[in-house]
Amino acid sequence: MYGGLGAHVLALTQAQARRGHEVAVITQAKPGDAGSHVNSNGVEVIRVANHYPDAQMVHERFANWVHGFALASQTACELMSRKPEIVHGHDWIAAGQLNVAAKQFSVPSVLTVHATEFGRHNGWLTSRLSQTIYANERRAVQSADSVIVCSEHMTHEIRCGYGVEPKNLNVIANAVSPLLSIAQRTTHNSENIVVGFIGRLEWEKGVHHIIDAMELIIDERVKLEIVGTGSQLANLQEKVQRKRLGDRVSFLGHIEDRDRAEIVQSWNLAVIPSSYEPFGIVALELGQVGVPIIASQVGGLRDIISSSEFGYLIGEISGGSIARGIESILSNQTLAIKKADRLRSRVEAEFTWDSVVDLTNSVYEKVSA
């Protein structure tokens, strides 16, 4: 399991196990590993070896990888300690084995959609790979007995882009685990004013817009820290050098989860300029720490920062709009901290794994009735 989807499945299944549910997870082993069958924090985990371990985003290789995972998962179903009462898959890659398991055990199937190819490209599916992914996604959501999405925006995306009936759609927001410890935010003593970004360095995440904003901000004390890696790293670094911002923009690379809160806490504000964000888990992670947020008014970000009480939303994603947002926060940091504190309280109260388990159980009960 990788990325945000893997983190979601890990947290959800462990929360379900703590409630007394018997949970088994079938996932792929690391490339080269033979597979394993273990109990991890109350969750039965079956990792299967894929005979096509190369998951490069090339059409033929990627299709083979997905097919190999489906074949391996069929055998893994027979290893489960008990017959399941329901099967739950995450995203279209798991759809093949989800359907096989549902038929094999004669039980209902639930599919959680974390993002879609249709939404990622605004419906413009020009490459063969995108068209293949879209076709698989469409089959997946239409064959599942019930579909879970993470935001109100995603219900529109699934209905319009994939033809799923509203009665089969359920909105369950994501969640974050409580921080083990975090010091109270204090006034920044540094002369620098730090703007932060954390996430994958991909085009849809909009980091290039923050770099454009830095060029427009005259105050040399304003610095940008970029946390994360991705396919756009080299392009972004070249953009920084071209704009002669090397002394004001730092690329920190990948930061382990346990160290992120400390880094984020040192920021004066954070920017989430995504053009596509089905949910926006990063807004919860930033909100949990209490850092003021500027976010684009897209997808699930609108559900989290639902009003100006909790942060700053920008309609037009551009360097100019981000620069104006940064200057607005810096002109009244007391107000910005109040908004951040309200968001932190909301995250702690509403976006919990206990709530996700309760809502997921309701879907299970409805689809099993």
Residue ranges and their predicted role:
Residues 188-214:
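Conserved donor-binding/catalytic core segment of Leloir-type glycosyltransferases
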Residues 153, 175:
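Carbohydrate-associated surface elements
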Residues 237-255:
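Nucleotide-activated donor-binding/catalytic signature segment of Leloir-type glycosyltransferases, i.e.
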Residues 1-45, 369:
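N-terminal subdomain of nucleotide-sugar transferases
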Residues 108, 118-139, 178:
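Nucleotide-sugar donor phosphate/pyrophosphate-binding loop at the beta->alpha transition
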Residues 275:
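Aromatic "clamp/platform" in nucleotide-sugar-dependent glycosyltransferases that forms part
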